[in-house]
Amino acid sequence: MRLCPHTLVGVESHIAVVGAGSWGTTVANAVVKNQATILWARRSELAEQISVQHKNNAYLPGVSLAENLRCSSVLQDVVANASIVMMAVPSNGFRDVAAAVAKFVATDVPIVSLAKGLERETLKRMSEVAQDLMPHNPVSVLTGPNLAQEILAGQPAATVVACGDERVGKMIQKIVSLPTLRVYTNPDVVGCEIAGVVKNVIAIAAGIVEGMGFGDNSKATLITRGLAEMSRLGVALGANPNTFMGLAGLGDVVATCASAKSRNTAVGVRLGRGETIESITESMSMVAEGVRSSLSVLQLAQRCKVEMPITEQVAAVCEGKTNAKDALVQLMARTMKSEFD
């Protein structure tokens, strides 16, 4: 679907949100309250449904979207003249879409990554991929404990804009802020992004514990030791350790691991009940990022010489090399050590 020329009359600039999955649509539906927003969908029929019916039945069934939210399947219509471009594309397709965006985006227009994953071939974070392709555009990250359905329902929440440029960070903060969504800035892009990636792996592990029928002690142990892994990797990459106790780290972990709405946690629960990763992924319309990211996180940790035993076992389960029960046995049989070594 191409936007009709009359829909752009009087709009000199707008926010572009690239990717009409559940999270991209949710963010677009939020920021359109503050500034004109155009969403990009790959499929023209979905773009028309969002623009005309104000629905996204594929990813957000039963949700009514803002009537002034527009959507197009023509990327140039969405990106041209945008004052900010938000990238809501999964990690496995991020580079290709970012390369296409780079052809149309103006120099110096801020790029905001909404994705939580690593590029499997290079182990780069999504902000690094975007910066590779758009070296003259400031790149930031939006992350935090933000479950789409709760944001859409207007429930109170907070999120983080991570940006090395304070001016750009504050501009994005203003655009995203709502009466029900408090936005903080953080200059630690590396830490915020690593937190979002590793959080998905921790969520799968927490789901496995739940699926195996274990209680709160087991889950609390898993989450706490997972946070230690997150912090070790982030600090090795130059992150601020305080980031992992904030919204991007602890906040996102708590929300995701406690939520039945989380795809990553749901995958873990099913793995814990004995299902294979193949049967789980075949049954899902949207693949959980943690399934893709677990091996990449482990490889990045090995590159940095950082020990991440929980991540190692989650990766083994997600790669079909072991089962949940044997993975737990391996974790519990590790050599005894000090908590903070």
Regions found by a protein language model. Give the residues of each.
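Hydrophobic anchor at the start of a short beta-strand
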Residues: I15, T37-I38, N137-V139, V183
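NAD(P)+-binding Rossmann beta1-loop-alpha1 motif at the extreme N-terminus of oxidoreductases
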Residues: L3-V63, R70-S73, A100
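Internal alpha-helical scaffold of NAD(P)-dependent oxidoreductase catalytic cores
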Residues: G93, F104, V129-N137, P156-T243
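Rossmann-like NAD(P)(H) cofactor-binding subdomain of soluble oxidoreductases
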Residues: L65, C71-P156, I172
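General beta-strand structural signal in soluble alpha/beta enzymes
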Residues: S113, P138-T143, V183-P187, G246, ...
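NAD(P)-dependent Rossmann-like dehydrogenase/reductase catalytic/cofactor-binding core
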Residues: K199, A206-E210, V235-M245, G249, ...
